[in-house]
Amino acid sequence: MGIFSIANQHIRFAVKLATAIVLALFVGFHFQLETPRWAVLTAAIVAAGPAFAAGGEPYSGAIRYRGFLRIIGTFIGCIAGLVIIIAMIRAPLLMILVCCIWAGFCTWISSLVRIENSYAWGLAGYTALIIVITIQPEPLLTPQFAVERCSEIVIGIVCAIMADLLFSPRSIKQEVDRELESLLVAQYQLMQLCIKHGDGEVVDKAWGDLVRRTTALQGMRSNLNMESSRWARANRRLKAINTLSLTLITQSCETYLIQNTRPELITDTFREFFDTPVETAQDVHKQLKRLRRVIAWTGERETPVTIYSWVAAATRYQLLKRGVISNTKINATEEEILQGEPEVKVESAERHHAMVNFWRTTLSCILGTLFWLWTGWTSGSGAMVMIAVVTSLAMRLPNPRMVAIDFIYGTLAALPLGLLYFLVIIPNTQQSMLLLCISLAVLGFFLGIEVQQRRLGSMGALASTINIIVLDNPMTFHFSQFLDSALGQIVGCVLAFTVILLVRDKSRDRTGRVLLNQFVSAAVSAMTTNVARRKENHLPALYQQLFLLMNKFPGDLPKFRLALTMIIAHQRLRDAPIPVNEDLSAFHRQMRRTADHVISARSDDKRRRYFGQLLEELEIYQEKLRIWQAPPQVTEPVHRLAGMLHKYQHALTDS
């Protein structure tokens, strides 16, 4: 396909984006807003942002959710801006510096919260800065400006949502149904690979792909939840299916690992059974029915615990899958499955990364302030706003450098494009609202095509062009003001990019070590006799950390295997029949404290000391288990865990 060709699937969203821009423009001028540009800019960003992220037309609910986050972020930013102005209006320089710190603080929070919700915090950071900078000439108009800004943004969001609803947004439900069927087949095929005990790299690739697909299914669940309240029952089932899918992966991989030391546990009966190939979910359904009969015939005691647990989880998965596809009322059996264990939320392992983002945003905003004050440039304030926007939005994404480059390309492209609109198109449409709407619709349509193709600079060009063309009420055409605004955007993006390059993010290795130690802590915490603690569901949180590890260290198989082994150890120890007595309970608490010290240690020496202490305690614990005559279901997983920690001691303690 050529660079200038238009794919059919991209046309509908391009029309949707053009409609959102035209609606916001018409409403803004109809209600005599002072700066309809903010409404148009908001409509464009809210509509185009999800499309750029998705690489195509976003699914139903995505634009509404982004608009909701933008409203929240704007209100938080406006309130923060008002508080800062009221408290420090007599010290303008201090007021701007506090705003720079506020932008950094919001970026820090956005780096720690869920990626879907981080947009609101990033927006809150630079909204306060925009308000403080804009009201510098007339501070007494701050409340009026804050109210107007909120009103214009809400109008833009409503217009984007109306355009989304007008052009029948895509539902993700069919994609979810197809993925549920396909995922079940892939789970069965993974178990086949693990029972065959073939090439380790093939197995690693298979379970790695399944972890990614399960994580993607969880993202689809979020989209389905945003789409409509009628999918509430399907959403509950999908949440449970996420845990079941992760359980299937864990049991399959444990089956593979068990055969490294005790291959005789998997009998020929099960090896022959899993030799039968499957292609569809219907094939898996038939095989599971036969497998349940085989287990009933051989008996639970003669069935390996991993296969027994896998079949139980696959059966529940099938039951809930049918409920998701049909979206029928939840029956008693399903309700029993859905009333599962409470999920545990794990502490973020990216605190150091978040602090780097804080300093990047704060320093870039302070650098912009110094540049503005030193040069006295009339558009220095515009450069500062772009610095805050780029750093606040770039820091929460995996590759901030590329986001900054995208903004630089976008602002450079906006200069000639904005010049065309400022000098030729808009002056010639002054007498006709219809012509003005058509001209902006054409801009939105073609940039909407480019945004869906993720063309470098397309998103930045859309926002930057709308920001510099004259869409105020009344319109005034001062070329020097236009040029200042356009150059201010470019300079701001370049300064932000410079700070991102200078303030290096070297937190990757530290994050990886913290993640691995969190896996160790989870495995140690599973050794408990506390009933409430044993019922906690750590699996989604553990696999979320594993997914982060896979993204941070692509292709690092030893790290993935170590993390997966810790997850398997956690699941096995969680179900192990540990003898109940005060001596072991007290020692469990001691080991958990030591594991927490390993995670929180700030130096390598302390970390090694606490890790060595943990290894010694595990040796003592194994001796205690022998004294209390614990069964092999307890002693064997503990012995395997201690062996793994001894083997990977340096990887878990050294920076």
UniProtKB/Swiss-Prot annotation:
Sequence similarity? Belongs to the aromatic acid exporter ArAE (TC 2.A.85) family.
Write down the species: Shigella boydii serotype 18 (strain CDC 3083-94 / BS512)
Q: Which InterPro entries match?
A: PHBA_efflux_AaeB/fusaric-R, PHBA_efflux_pump_AaeB
The molecule here is called p-hydroxybenzoic acid efflux pump subunit AaeB
Superkingdom to which the source organism belongs: Bacteria
GO cellular component term of the entry, any: plasma membrane
Q: Which Pfam families match?
A: FUSC (PF04632)
Q: Name one GO biological process term.
A: carboxylic acid transport
Q: What's the main place this protein lives?
A: membrane
